[in-house]
């Protein structure tokens, strides 16, 4: 195995791109692809065959959790980095939808659109890591968050990495531009080296942010838990996927655990951001009722009324004195 080869990776885990890289296989009519040692069994539901049933189920859960996180972020109207972090969750949602379409077999392998969907999946993964990296700078207030510069810097860098990863993937799959399924160094560098660097730099920046600017150390727990579950997911995917698959009679494989662990890691990104972010209550719009609670009523004789004590005033018998308010049945 040389640097950038997917032979050993695809032998252990059935990644979608494994059917698009590697030498031609005479056992599959000369088609390109690397066959994994073990595949998760398919599930038949309503006369429809669903590939990777367990992983597909986790994708659906991830979509629901992402919607909840987006709604919570949107409710924090004045939080620092609100627009930037919500872009991260939108990209994660798009990646989850694309992965669900691929893993569930909506676009089956060997079909015409399949290489383009896998290339889009790779592009979204690169865009997600780049978006996370740029979000790491927001907390340092190098530029004003939520502004045109901040938001579009994030969007453009993420879009550029999506295009770069998509093009390298599709050129490799289609043997275009001097690239080929047997020359996967560029694809390996973009998918693994650059993405790993983005995540590592983000983690270092957040550690510096917490240690230097915050007195509370609880956010370090969110970072640590996110890193642990992410690493566990990657190890289960790339090192033990075939072992898991064989021992559970092909019901599960490493892709199921990696998808679940990635969801937990993304949730820790949200928890970390939510914990270190404070709203400006003076300018925020409350969405929860009864934010201010009256503990007890004043005595009757101490209540303020709008009646004037001067009986000779022309305003003493104002018609507004006895008008009932629609809020709390109070009299004005």
Swiss-Prot record:
One GO CC term, this protein: endoplasmic reticulum membrane
Keywords on record: Cell wall biogenesis/degradation, Endoplasmic reticulum, Membrane, Protein transport, Transmembrane, Transmembrane helix, Transport
Example of a GO biological process term: cell wall organization
Domain of life per record: Eukaryota
One GO molecular-function entry: unfolded protein binding
First-listed, main subcellular location of the protein, grouped into a coarse class: endoplasmic reticulum
Mode of membrane association: Multi-pass membrane protein
Keyword Glycosyltransferase: no
Pfam families: Chs7
Subcellular localization(s) per the UniProt record: Endoplasmic reticulum membrane
Membrane-spanning segments: 49-69, 85-105, 123-143, 151-171, 185-205, 220-240, 250-270
Family designation: Belongs to the CHS7 family.
Biological function: Chaperone required for the export of the chitin synthase chs3 from the endoplasmic reticulum.
Subunit structure: Interacts with chs3.
Protein name (Swiss-Prot/TrEMBL): Chitin synthase export chaperone
Organism encoding this protein: Aspergillus clavatus (strain ATCC 1007 / CBS 513.65 / DSM 816 / NCTC 3887 / NRRL 1 / QM 1276 / 107)
